[in-house]
């Protein structure tokens, strides 16, 4: 069970809604993933119509919506988008994204911290997408963010946990949930994140662009479950030296 702010989730896999070939395929993949929290880019939705091709099937699916501010380049733009989302969708939950460079889509740490502090004061449950910077994540926690979402690698790159060393520090020091976001390309990446101690992962591109998104969503669900179980089982310590699992000499002495 995962608790963030005022909500609890059975699934530790969060999903996105971008890049799917159709809304129907998107919903089928989300259902196969078991995800209960789904991100939604405000710039891709017609907030005036609840029969929007993306929004309507998500509402029908009964998932918790996490609108995001993707496309915002400044704190002011992100705050404005957040206020629109709260009014239109009736939710105070928000994934805060501010990335001014369209090529790399890396989050702006200064604008993110600035916006997060303001949005928390306005009553939002803020989940900020941020770089894998332990100091920044601690500052975001201190201003009241309900979780932190450090990247594993650039958005949509499928590179995996390139920031593993920093993620380990973030996880160790955090007192709010840590959701590894961006760069997760295959289910084994997700399993590794959960084994490391992350509370959840957010996956979009890896599922949406697969030849079979529904099958890939299922694979991610199973990988996240496996990673969580492995962590709870407490793996043995790594060792520099070999350690035999069977006697090396006893059987020879018995035959002598």
From Swiss-Prot:
Query: Catalytic site residues?
Result: 95
HAMAP family (UniProt xref): ThiG
Q: What is one GO cellular-component annotation here?
A: cytoplasm
Q: In which pathway does it act?
A: Cofactor biosynthesis; thiamine diphosphate biosynthesis
Localization: Cytoplasm
Enzymatic reactions: [ThiS sulfur-carrier protein]-C-terminal-Gly-aminoethanethioate + 2-iminoacetate + 1-deoxy-D-xylulose 5-phosphate = [ThiS sulfur-carrier protein]-C-terminal Gly-Gly + 2-[(2R,5Z)-2-carboxy-4-methylthiazol-5(2H)-ylidene]ethyl phosphate + 2 H2O + H(+)
> What the protein does?
Catalyzes the rearrangement of 1-deoxy-D-xylulose 5-phosphate (DXP) to produce the thiazole phosphate moiety of thiamine. Sulfur is provided by the thiocarboxylate moiety of the carrier protein ThiS. In vitro, sulfur can be provided by H(2)S.
Gene Ontology terms for molecular function: thiazole synthase activity
Q: Which keywords does this Swiss-Prot/TrEMBL entry list?
A: Cytoplasm, Schiff base, Thiamine biosynthesis, Transferase
Please state the Enzyme Commission number of this protein.
2.8.1.10
Its predominant location is: cytoplasm
GO biological process assignments: thiamine diphosphate biosynthetic process
Q: Which InterPro entries match?
A: Aldolase_TIM, Thiazole_synthase_ThiG, ThiG
Which EC class, in a word? transferase
Upper taxonomic classification of the species?
Bacteria, Pseudomonadati, Pseudomonadota, Gammaproteobacteria, Enterobacterales
Q: Report the protein name in the record.
A: Thiazole synthase
Sites where the protein binds 1-deoxy-D-xylulose 5-phosphate: 156, 182-183, 204-205
